Amino acid sequence: MGQNNSTPLSLTLDHWKDVRTRAHNLSVKIRKGKWQTFCSSEWPTFGVGWPPEGTFNLSVIFAVKRIVFQETGGHPDQVPYIVVWQDLAQSPPPWVPPSAKIAVVSSPENTRGPSAGRPSAPPRPPIYPATDDLLLLSEPPPYPAALPPPLAPPAVGPAPGQAPDSSDPEGPAAGTRSRRARSPADDSGPDSTVILPLRAIGPPAEPNGLVPLQYWPFSSADLYNWKSNHPSFSENPAGLTGLLESLMFSHQPTWDDCQQLLQILFTTEERERILLEARKNVLGDNGAPTQLENLINEAFPLNRPQWDYNTAAGRERLLVYRRTLVAGLKGAARRPTNLAKVREVLQGPAEPPSVFLERLMEAYRRYTPFDPSEEGQQAAVAMAFIGQSAPDIKKKLQRLEGLQDYSLQDLVREAEKVYHKRETEEERQEREKKEAEERERRRDRRQEKNLTRILAAVVSERGSRDRQTGNLSNRARKTPRDGRPPLDKDQCAYCKEKGHWARECPQKKNVREAKVLALDDQGSRGSDPLPEPRVTLTVEGTPIEFLVDTGAEHSVLTQPMGKVGSRRTVVEGATGSKVYPWTTKRLLKIGHKQVTHSFLVIPECPAPLLGRDLLTKLKAQIQFSAEGPQVTWEDRPTMCLVLNLEEEYRLHEKPVPSSIDPSWLQLFPTVWAERAGMGLANQVPPVVVELRSGASPVAVRQYPMSKEAREGIRPHIQRFLDLGVLVPCQSPWNTPLLPVKKPGTNDYRPVQDLREINKRVQDIHPTVPNPYNLLSSLPPSHTWYSVLDLKDAFFCLKLHPNSQPLFAFEWRDPEKGNTGQLTWTRLPQGFKNSPTLFDEALHRDLAPFRALNPQVVLLQYVDDLLVAAPTYRDCKEGTQKLLQELSKLGYRVSAKKAQLCQKEVTYLGYLLKEGKRWLTPARKATVMKIPPPTTPRQVREFLGTAGFCRLWIPGFASLAAPLYPLTKESIPFIWTEEHQKAFDRIKEALLSAPALALPDLTKPFTLYVDERAGVARGVLTQTLGPWRRPVAYLSKKLDPVASGWPTCLKAVAAVALLLKDADKLTLGQNVTVIASHSLESIVRQPPDRWMTNARMTHYQSLLLNERVSFAPPAVLNPATLLPVESEATPVHRCSEILAEETGTRRDLKDQPLPGVPAWYTDGSSFIAEGKRRAGAAIVDGKRTVWASSLPEGTSAQKAELVALTQALRLAEGKDINIYTDSRYAFATAHIHGAIYKQRGLLTSAGKDIKNKEEILALLEAIHLPKRVAIIHCPGHQKGNDPVATGNRRADEAAKQAALSTRVLAETTKPQELIXPAQVKTRPGELTPDRGKEFIQRLHQLTHLGPEKLLQLVNRTSLLIPNLQSAVREVTSQCQACAMTNAVTTYRETGKRQRGDRPGVYWEVDFTEVKPGRYGNRYLLVFIDTFSGWVEAFPTKTETALTVCKKILEEILPRFGIPKVLGSDNGPAFVAQVSQGLATQLGINWKLHCAYRPQSSGQVERMNRTIKETLTKLALETGXKDWVALLPLALLRARNTPGRFGLTPYEILYGGPPPILESGGTLGPDDNFLPVLFTHLKALEVVRTQIWDQIKEVYKPGTVAIPHPFQVGDQVLVRRHRPGSLEPRWKGPYLVLLTTPTAVKVDGIAAWVHASHLKPAPPSAPDESWELEKADHPLKLRIRRRRNESAK
């Protein structure tokens, strides 16, 4: 190791191109990788003396060749390689040195091959001098005494194919060599050029012994080279895998060396994976991987083993360890398949195909577990090679015929042809230049042609005018003179010379001629062309020169420059008309303006035109001067300002005049930011930002930034860098930088998006003051103010170095050399905790100032400071001291925004003046300019903006109450006049907003409260002498629960609500509450039926506070003077009002009435058979008065309400006691029902309460009885008193009703509950109103005409007065029929062919309908001509297969085979399939013309009927899917009476349809309630009708023997699948065992069901057995006797 001597293998690899050429000449193909593998790893194992570094010794080559060419056990894949080696040795190329041509490079141990018996030529002197030991630090250990070399090698070697002598040394020592040079006379072998860890140090001590080995470690240079020259194992495992595989066979590493290689070349994770895979590949005794731990540890130890490498066993174990380690390397190198990485490998524009293939195969090896050189992977590699090649090569390869037969070499060869035939860059440029010139010539020719046509038209028109005006006398056309020759194309008409025209003739005199299309005036430009007005505009980033054409209506482009829209325009030109397209919107940039415009695309136009449309949009002006026409337009930039609506008032604010005296600037020069620069708080430690637990770095890529924006924020970034606020860094955190354009200027400011950082930083409690009550601590006596605004406040606080990497962002400035990340050294803006951190730091710094200056009041809101003092002197002194303190602390104040020692200042959006706060005119102007909203979001924005001013608006909540419902997105937005009035009233109230006094915390407060329409309104006041000054106007809407309370309780809720808001202004001072109710008595003795204990406790904690006192109602309550909608309530006593408003009925009792019957109600709900069953019942103690089951899923509470409601209805006009064991129903009737009704049946969350409909029904039914008492009784009692017994019976009746199918009310004496007006005179007779309602319901289901509907009603058993007029009225008022029915016209009655019985004669037709569900577009209609029965089937297609399928699957099984089928000549009916089916079935298929009434009138009329019915149903239901409505249309068609008064149903089935039976679906009922109730009644009727037929099935069966078979019987067993001509039964079989349902027989393993058996017929036996008694008691004698008769 470390020498530079070349070896045969390295020589061939260095000159591989020559080697491959020689192989090509030999008609073989070789690969570089296999060449190296065979030479260094494979052939040295043959035992013929082949060294790993190769040799040109012919004897060794021939020995390897014999093994390779063996018939059995040979290596055909190695044949090309050994043949090339032989050719190189026999005909050496020039780069083979002379010594290598005859040298035998082999070790003494490796010369035992077939060539060992041949005398070798004496070695020549070495080319290089002998080298001493290369280890620089220490000498190698002393060698043992060298033994004399053997005199001669063995005479005879083993024959080819014969195994070498087992006594010969094997293992790693077989190929080791010494590093020291040997003398030329030494016959032991040539010197090796490779340093090995295990090296032979001499001949073996014994003739057949092992060569002693000595350990030499790897050099650091080799390890460094291997580490640096190979990619990492994770990136490319093939590199290190090949390296270690070669090292294992060439360098003889020991166990320690292997560990050293693993430690240096691999990472910890890679090393563990390799060792794990290696231990999985340890082979057992059977040659397969073993799982035994002892064998694994023995073959592949993880700890250093005690192996002796000078013994055969040690060398064998080392060899096994190396092989296992290589197997582990290969196993760990397997990667999951990632074909996406393979598809990313594309051929470069100038990349040769062979290089691209090599890269592609390398990608396969790296990203897939496949070997691309394997035969099975060639197809995939070939497809990838074709698909990922360059476009021209890919196009060529895809066109090859028989592509599947091409190998990779063939594809590369074809690709090389295309690659080498490519045109060069110069050729491509030349070709493109010629094509451009050709296009230019064609365009010029077209333009010349068009101009020629135009001039010809103009000249001809002028000539015609001349002929009409000046040549009237001579209208004949002039002919040329006789003999005058015609002129050539380039001949002059004046001098007859060629090469010029007459106007350019030099011999012609300069005579001024009249010019065509020009004016004759003095001083004109003559024949020179006028300057054309042209402008250059940037369209989609491309500058284009336009010709200004005011005569053109539209602007024109010659090329679309992008997508073309669908719009087209016909253009009339001189050569005719043509259609041209329009472009989509294109972006134009004109100066600082940007507009979008659509252009007309006319490729034939000579130049782009700027028409009147774009000139108007640009407001262009065209000026004509001596220099030529000039086009100008308004170039003022359009600015867009985006801001929040609540900040819009700042646009209307007048700029605060700078009233700073220059003396202030001179006295404190270090505090003003304009002079002193950026500040730095010198007493605040650096801020440390704490992360959340588990937070990991996040890196958000920088968003793309325009050049303009980058240039705009560059000065700011550079300024921060110069000030040290920004510093370069390298951080795993990164957040994007956003350039924000400042309104009104082109300046940008950098804003960092710190949202991801804010998510990962711990939250701290915000201590920033609330601006709502900040001014409450300002005494009204302080009327002199100073306002200071700190400049760059957050940047005054330093950021701890450990926290700075969190706020890194990416910034590139090539001009300044800044590329990478920057971060903040100060507290950044946009960080969520910055306001709190700065507010706390500034508050701590200013604490000494507050303590030393009690004469002034200092208010701080983050970086806004307010100094208030009672006098100017105090204010000035306090302001000076504050400025001095701020300068000392390191803060900076903005001189532009400072307001010093003034009586009127603006602070936090308020105007402070004379101890009061006012709304600024800017805020009022903002609200006044808001237009009426059109969306819920705009309503919320208006209420939010106006809500900021609600302290100045009396009763703001009342004014805004109509607008609150419009803020919800879930309801439709409808702006009505009521909303507009509320909108205007809020604006008007804002204009008259008064001044509010600042709260004086030294005085008590008075709160006047009033409640109107669910809104709490109040005024917070303080006394000033004899007057009360308002501090704030308060108003708030009550929650839905409190809104439903009585007036007195709503007043309590209003006081509690407003008192909480007033506490924000009073800061816990004493408050006196004045209202128009005796609130204190209500709060101290609250009612127990209106509010929960939690709510009452909350109210008591607020109102029964020692600082809250209640005063008697005042004569004049300022709160009641607020605008109200009704008069004030009269004077009352709250306790009486609450008692009156508690119940729903004053005489409702909760104790039984004496001498009154008692009913017991109960509801039951339970789960049976996985379903929740429910029922309700009423009993009177002896019998059931009413019982019914309820819909599935009904709760027990709902069932109780239903039972109680039904009892109240049945007791209408009576005196009754009703008992219920439900607390829910009892409380609803007595207490909660009234409360629910008052607050709109809403919960505290504003949602509908449960069982809303049942509660409303109960509240209405309570008033029906004459006198009623609803009593609560305990449930499930075991006593014998009447109440307990009645309750138990009611409970049992409810449970039975729940299990039954009865779902309708069942009354004992219904006649007692019917009013006299409702008593029917005859059974079945209806009142006119009920009759009309019945007809309407029937018409809604059928939509029949008046005649058919009248026939249908007459078939019922109902008697309806004025039936005909009612039918005509109902049908004439039907909107769906009016919109669908056609106008009837008189026609003569025709005749049609009909069948003589049902199912004989059918007519069939297709009709097209609009697309419906599942893609159905057609309707296949069959109609029986005899009965009129119709069948209709939705279909997707109109084909013969569909017709045949419906005939076979629908018509034949149900109606039989028809004799005649009639249809038109449609393709589906005349097809061979349809006619063939008719022939096979014997159907006479009659074809006729379409729409012929005599032949197909019945089916055509039915098509119309079905379509009309579907249309009516769709109009009524609003549904669009006609497929779902088709069954209802068929119901109408099948139950419509015909001309004989019979419906198709009656003709076909011989009876009326179920819907016409009395009491059916349409039958009237005393309680004619909703549709669901009617359908349930119909279900009961149907169940009653069919019960008699099916009840026999449900009777319990008789106890009988299930089958007659007994043990010992002979039975026959049925075959499951009898074959052709095979009996159905098999057997007989003997019965062995029986069960009630199955039988076990002899000969069949499985049990046989009794239904598959029958008794076998009796037969005469041919033999019998007899039992005879024997003498021995334990013996029996059985005798067989032949039956002679059976023979």
UniProtKB/Swiss-Prot annotation:
GO annotations of cellular component type:
host cell late endosome membrane; host cell plasma membrane; host multivesicular body; membrane; viral nucleocapsid
Residues under site feature: Cleavage:
Y128, P129, L196, P197, L455, A456, L517, A518, L641, V642, P1310, Q1311
Per the Swiss-Prot or TrEMBL annotation, the motif PTAP/PSAP motif is positioned at 108-111
**Residues covered by the Integrase catalytic domain:** 1394-1552
- Binding of Mg(2+) 1, residues: D789, D863, D864
Q: Which residues form the active site?
A: D549
Positions of the zinc fingers (HHCC-type)?
1339-1377
What's the entry's take on its domains? Gag polyprotein: Late-budding domains (L domains) are short sequence motifs essential for viral particle budding. They recruit proteins of the host ESCRT machinery (Endosomal Sorting Complex Required for Transport) or ESCRT-associated proteins. RNA-binding phosphoprotein p12 contains one L domain: a PPXY motif which potentially interacts with the WW domain 3 of NEDD4 E3 ubiquitin ligase. Matrix protein p15 contains one L domain: a PTAP/PSAP motif, which potentially interacts with the UEV domain of TSG101.
Concerning SMART domains, the annotation shows:
ZnF_C2HC (SM00343)
Q: Where is the composition biased (Basic and acidic residues)?
A: 420-451, 479-490
Q: What domain of life does the native source organism fall in?
A: Viruses
**InterPro entries (alphabetical):** Aspartic_peptidase_AS, DNA/RNA_pol_sf, G_retro_matrix, G_retro_matrix_sf, Gag_P30, Integrase_cat-core, MLVIN_C, Peptidase_A2_cat
Peptidase A2 domain span: 544-614
Residues that coordinate or bind Mg(2+) 3: D1405, D1464
**Biased composition regions of type Pro residues, renumbered to the chain:** 139-157
Region span, Disordered: 106-197, 420-490
Q: Where are the zinc fingers (CCHC-type)?
A: 490-507
**Family, similarity comment:** Belongs to the retroviral Pol polyprotein family.
Q: Which organism is it from?
A: Woolly monkey sarcoma virus
Q: What is this protein identified as?
A: Gag-Pol polyprotein
Query: What binding details are noted for the cofactor?
Result: The RT polymerase active site binds 2 magnesium ions. Binds 1 magnesium ion for ribonuclease H (RNase H) activity.
